[in-house]
Amino acid sequence: MRGGRVLAFLHAALALGLAAAAAGTAAPGAALPPADEKGLTDLQLLGKRVFEDANLSEPRGLSCASCHAPEHAFQGNNGSPIPGIAAGSSPDKVGRRKVPTIMYKTYSPAFGLTKDVDDGKETAEAKGGQFWDGRASDLVEQAASPLLDPVEMNNPSIEVVVEKVKAGAYADLVTAVFGKAVFADPKTAMNDLSSALFAYEATERFAPFSSKFDDYLRGKATLTPEEARGFEVFTNPKQGNCIACHVGEVKSKDPTDWIFTDFTYDALGVPRNPAIPANADPATFDLGLCKRPGIAAFLPKDVKLESLCGQFKVPTLRNVAVAGAYYHNAYFTSLRDAVAFYATRDTDPQRWYPKLKTGEADKFNDLSGALKDNVNTEEVPYDRRPGQKPRFSDADIDALVAFLKTLTDKGMK
């Protein structure tokens, strides 16, 4: 793929204004574009057309926007009965992971893996990429994946996708942006369409920084006492310690320094979600990072692949209050429960996990055998044991939820 070259070109073009003329400029007497298309370049407008095209699935009827609904912070489930887990283009197909927001995704670096040493033990730290398991290095590479996924848009090949675009309503826009020969080579055409999607997803609507917290940083809003307490719990390394992974520059008033993720991966031992059809097979486990295609090529010497099993990418917390479901498997449908799980996973595991015949909690039940040892149990707030006091209280949980609600961008619901 030409993803790296396309990304470099796009970043330069978007920054310098060298992309095609803005689509919001209409000729005298011509119909004005919809309000949400004003100011878009032709490249960005093409990306929007692809994003909203429900003819690109097999069978037709499913678009990117079907699962990534703009009003829900570009996430959703396409009418699935399982919160956060999307139905595919075929009515009998349902995914196994929560649909992630694609807002603020352009801030994620390309996927990489570095060697680390933790208490004398060699480990590997993954960072960046797209999807819960990082299987796409960047957004250009990511764009084609749902189109070909049999559980999502279900196209059998790139050639089929490109032929649909060629026969579609905006084929003239494709040739205007990329030239008349664009459809000659399907792989090149697919990469060009992916770059258009990237250009659209790099627009301000995907990273508006319009939340109350952003206004607070700018000095235009004040946090309530409860929200301020929640922010303290969030940043306190001896309480929530959320900022350890959902990072922000504490001294910065620039919203772009607060993406609320370090783009790394972690194993949290989230309870198994019985609502996911694939989980009906007790021998089936979603192992995340260690099953990323091509992961072995990134793996440092002397680091075992199995050590990455159970890890999933740390998501941004921006717009988390409108997510509707939480964690990679959408097990939690309440933001308060998702936060309480952090606080009490290890002090009261029976609250979250099913019981074994012994009466004990089947802790980390979405991992098998020795892979349960991969779960993060040392970092605050997970460094507690049954009977110990949680790192933060019920009142702190309420305050933290109140703070997280300040991260919702305007217009999201």
How should each PLM-predicted stretch be described?
Residues 8-20:
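Bacterial N-terminal signal peptides
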